[in-house]
Structures are given as C-alpha cells and as structure tokens.
Amino acid sequence: MTNADNINEPRLIVETGLDQRIAAIIEPVIVGMDYRLVRVRLMNQNGLTLQVMAERNDGSMNVQGCEEISTAISPVLDVEDPVDKAYHLEVSSPGIDRPMVRKSDFVRWNGHIVKCETSILVDNRKRFRGKITDVNDDGFTIERDQVAYGEEPKVTIPFSTLAEAKLILTDDLIRDALRADKQAKAEAANQNEADEEE
C-alpha cells in the first residue's frame, strides 16, 4: 500500500455523536494538508478538551505538524462552532501505544501486541489481546498471550466486527517505532536535499 493509498484509506473505527460531527468538519482540512486523521475525542479533562490525533501518511508526526494542524483547524472549528462550551484544543500524534484505526495500521504493526474489543462475539469473546500474526483484507489474526482452557491459541478477528483496538507498549514496539521514526526523518532530509538541488 503506497502513501497515496494511505491518505484515502478509510478508518475502520470512527466516532459517533458530537465527535463524529467534529471529525467531519476537520478531516477535510487535515487531509488537504497531507495528514491523516486518527481519532477525535471530546473529553472532560482540564475543563473540556478536544483531542485530535493525526499523523503523516507514513505514520510519523512531529511537534511542527501538530502546530500546523492546530493552526489550520482552529478557525474552522470557530466558524462551525460544534461545541457549545469553552474547550481546549489538543492536537497530538497517536503515540507509540496508538489506536489502530485502519487496515494499514495492522499491516504496519504486524508482529506486535494489540488489545482489541469487538462489537459482537468472536470465538465466544469480545475482548482480545495478543500478537498480530497475519493481516488480510477481511481481518487479522492474533496469537493470544493468555489462552483460556478450551480456546485456540490463535483467533482471526474480522475488521467488520472491530469496535476498538490499540497497540500495547513493549520494548519491541518502542524499538521498532524509534527505527521507523529515524527512517522517516532520514527520508525527509533526503527529500529536502533533493528539493534544494532542483
């Protein structure tokens, strides 16, 4: 899957209610800046906080990107005024233990531990935790890290049943996330050098 495909890739897990309305307002702005919306959540934290998670198409994000998005979406939110109370706008990266909201997230983080919940029973459960071992167009397979008596060690979870999913912080995840960030920075530096030569 290329970065061009990633920007148009739909999210598997989307907001509801007011969060959904806010996402509909800001997502076109974020996509127009070559970023992807990960999640919107209005929380009762420090008064009222509107948390917006976004990332570049390659999955990276830095403070400058957060500032750019905040500057771009703030006036749009002021005009549309979806929240009828004062709130703090917080734009951030999804972080290392990120929410998994697109199929490409599962492909990218294959081999890492995910915790997820389904909207219906899958293999007589709704909550799962384990290492992602396979991903296809219809779902992903995890190897459970705690197998109950009578359960198979591996379970395939259809994307259509997914209600929530996030990576679990491990040493391997930190190592791979730092490696991916270093690679993204090197590619950005190479692109800047190529642009300067032209």
UniProtKB/Swiss-Prot annotation:
Localization per record: Cytoplasm
Location (main, coarse): cytoplasm
GO biological process terms, semicolon-separated: ribosomal small subunit assembly; translation
InterPro entries attached to this UniProt entry: Ribosome_maturation_RimP, RimP_C, RimP_C_sf, RimP_N, RimP_N_sf
HAMAP family: RimP
Family membership noted in the UniProt record: Belongs to the RimP family.
Name of the molecule in the record: Ribosome maturation factor RimP
Organismal lineage: Bacteria, Pseudomonadati, Pseudomonadota, Alphaproteobacteria, Hyphomicrobiales
